[in-house]
Amino acid sequence: MKMKILLIGGGGREHAIAEGIKKSKHNPILYALMAKKNPGIAALCEDFLLEKETEVEKVVEYAKARKIEMAFVGPEAPLAAGVADALWDAGIPVVGPKKACAIIEFDKAWARNFMKKYGIEGCPAYEVFTEEAPAHAFIEKLGDVAVKPSGLTGGKGVKVMGDQLPDIKAAREYTSELLEKGPVVIEERFIGEEFTLQAFVDGKNLAFFPAVQDHKRAYEGDIGPNTGGMGSYTDAGEILPFMVPEDIEKAKKIMQHTVTALREETGTGYQGILYGQFILTSRGPKVVEFNARFGDPEAMNVIPLIETDFVEIMSAVTKGTLGDLPVKFSRKATVCKYAVPAGYPDNPKKDSEVIVGDIGEASVYYASVYEKEGKIYTTTSRAVAVVGCAETIEAAEKVAQNALENIQGELFFRRDIGTASLIQKRIDHMKELRG
């Protein structure tokens, strides 16, 4: 009997997960539940339901009706809503942590307090505030700060001094604005190069993916407003060109400690994807944040590199047997680039047709688009991602860039992601910081 698997979520990340599942030698039958029809996911599915991914009862109802045997939750919102808990309660194993553990992403204040309680390395000096006067005083005291809303913001709520906040006055004003909606985390600003480390987790064991570097700024040269991520790259191997092996080993230890501490704190094993966003400083890797799911775009870099059967990995995650399964990756470099609507992220042009031409050797992943009468149109978010995979970053970048040149529509993208000049800038920056 072929296994019936349900995928929850409808973005570019979920398109990559769907592809990973469908490549399995076990020929699983894939079902999807997504808020909007993703044409890439729909094409890989036996059947799908268009429904809000946070409607817990509807998710369980659909899973039972389709006799689902295992589920994968892609985005953070359904995890925060307790979708994984409800599916487990219905006897359906899930890749995606229960709410008690997913809190590490959806409550930034909880996450920092948890790190402090368990002595998890890489935690900045920070405080959590609900009132203006002490928050403003703490900003004055620290001087160089990052200001974060405590809840989920789709990766766009954090503002940092020297970047989006030109001075202390701006930091105070932004803090006051956020405090109207809820608690605010104010922490020391780290200076360095960011990287993402993701892992499959079975409650105890972690299987790490190669490190990825994402590019949050909208425009070339790392300028402009923050976005959900304009593109990312991996090198052939597990570290990035500006890293040394010791950096990734330290980051792995932090994530392992986090998983062990989560079990102790919550009484529940963390089963799913743990995403560590790190910043590599002169004092080693520090934790920017943890997420309870794959990154988007980072998922599209790493999923195509998995050589071990994806469904077997999912099964091991749900059974706690990841330690018995060697998870292998091909030693190739990848470059992912997003084509986004003109005006994104502040004033995106929606309902504009997207025509995907000859993309050559690249992979294409549909994100926030919709299909109407056989044509594909933009919404207000990132539209289509392309991924080049090759022996070197430079070669992978060319594959991705050539594919983008053959996608038509009122779109733009960053040509500089994965290029030698931008990577050299990162290497030089780290050399300077390390002295």
UniProtKB/Swiss-Prot annotation:
Annotated residues for binding of Mn(2+) 2: E289, N291
First-level EC class: ligase
UniProt keyword Nucleotide-binding, yes or no: yes
Binding site for Mg(2+) 1: Q277, E289
SUPFAM superfamilies, alphabetized: Glutathione synthetase ATP-binding domain-like, PreATP-grasp domain, Rudiment single hybrid motif
Pfam families assigned: GARS_A, GARS_C, GARS_N
Obligatory cofactor(s): Mg(2+); Mn(2+)
Entry's Gene Ontology BP terms: 'de novo' IMP biosynthetic process; purine nucleobase biosynthetic process
Disulfide bond sites: none
Residue numbers binding Mg(2+) 2: E289, N291
Cofactor mode of binding and number, as noted: Binds 2 magnesium or manganese ions per subunit.
NCBIfam families per record: purD (TIGR00877)
Record protein name field: Phosphoribosylamine--glycine ligase
Provenance organism: Methanosarcina mazei (strain ATCC BAA-159 / DSM 3647 / Goe1 / Go1 / JCM 11833 / OCM 88)
